[in-house]
Amino acid sequence: MSEPIHQPFWLDSKPVVFPPTHLAMTEPDGLLAVGGDLTPEWLLNAYHKGIFPWFNEDDPILWWTPNPRSVLFINSLKVRRSLIKTIRKQQFTVTLDQQFEDVMHQCANIERHDQDGTWISEEMLSAYTQLHKSGHAHSVEVWKDNQLVGGLYGVAIGKVFFGESMFSKVPDASKIALVALCQQLKAWGFRIIDTQMETAHLRSLGATLISREYFESILKQETHKDFAPKPWTLEVDWQAPFLAQPTIKKQKTTTP
């Protein structure tokens, strides 16, 4: 196996070809290539290989494949007691694919303490909107009092969901989006969400680090499973597993 390179590969707009992922840089971790394009063909080719674009506005397109990789196995989602209490109040409603562009705009504009500016440029908005129209990119919307207060978006290929970004305007709204998404994906037979880079927030929700090699082996299995691109609708009662169960009182028995 070749040693990791110290410079990223430079890509032309054609052909749509990425270098082998094991040639990605180790510093910065996972930077593989520069250039290419953000057409649906480029993006879908990238996600199939576990590669994603991430770059600042006005910079060239940067393609990444970090090692290790942050992922959330859906059965490992952590729903803490405080979040269960919030769910039980039933103050939120959740939809899928109703306001994709709005969710992306909210993700782009929300203030984050760990970054200056946004990487979700107009170029990215346009590219992922095209993927949404073709049934590959999806959004989760969280509503409270008929206002959009949280959500997330990402790309689905086969039975892998590649999470891109999330936002929250009120406490727990982005967590609600993830919980509802996991309930629906589980019902459809998905078992993994790619969360890309490790963060304390994602780790608290159950995300874990796995090797690039293991991640790519999962992709080879799961992205080829039959799940046609289409608009999504929420088909499950995502709150049901968390609602308080009625207490059944045992009847006293008396001996004759």
UniProtKB/Swiss-Prot annotation:
Keywords: Acyltransferase, Cytoplasm, Transferase. InterPro entries: Acyl_CoA_acyltransferase, Leu/Phe-tRNA_Trfase, Leu/Phe-tRNA_Trfase_C, Leu/Phe-tRNA_Trfase_N. Its main location: cytoplasm. GO terms for molecular function: leucyl-tRNA--protein transferase activity. The keyword Repeat does not apply. One of its GO terms (biological process) is protein catabolic process. GO terms for cellular component: cytoplasm. Its EC number is 2.3.2.6. It catalyses: N-terminal L-lysyl-[protein] + L-leucyl-tRNA(Leu) = N-terminal L-leucyl-L-lysyl-[protein] + tRNA(Leu) + H(+); N-terminal L-arginyl-[protein] + L-leucyl-tRNA(Leu) = N-terminal L-leucyl-L-arginyl-[protein] + tRNA(Leu) + H(+); L-phenylalanyl-tRNA(Phe) + an N-terminal L-alpha-aminoacyl-[protein] = an N-terminal L-phenylalanyl-L-alpha-aminoacyl-[protein] + tRNA(Phe). It is found in: Cytoplasm. It holds the Pfam family Leu_Phe_trans. Functions in the N-end rule pathway of protein degradation where it conjugates Leu, Phe and, less efficiently, Met from aminoacyl-tRNAs to the N-termini of proteins containing an N-terminal arginine or lysine. NCBIfam families: aat. Belongs to the L/F-transferase family. This is Leucyl/phenylalanyl-tRNA--protein transferase. It comes from Hydrogenovibrio crunogenus (strain DSM 25203 / XCL-2). The gene is aat.
